[in-house]
């Protein structure tokens, strides 16, 4: 049975407890469910299906079990491992102190976007399929990279650090 990762937008320890989230995914019929960190990352086994169907199942179960649904983006674990092995940051001069982030899109962008784009030290470097690769230097203004990403791609997305994606893919 294939293994998948679900990345949920807007989940944090203050608005969703991980045991309840795990139970919601189990109620959706998924097996081998495990949460990773406290930020809405869920790994699970499911019969082979489209990402869209799995997303709908997870969101319906969260609505039923938790009383709210979080935007859910599903990727096969094998796809995440290939993404990590490809090191999409390698062609770019990313400072060692920069945070590397991956943004997962729910669908394809509506317009063709010329990359790289930069704003206040945040750079959107590349896009491959439904993933966007960015880097930023921590800034007193807060997460300016999210302003740039949402302005460019909308809000049907969620972002994780490169390190978090690696933990989820293990």
Residue spans for each PLM region:
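Surface-exposed, charge/polar-rich loops and edge strands
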Residues: 1-39, 43-170
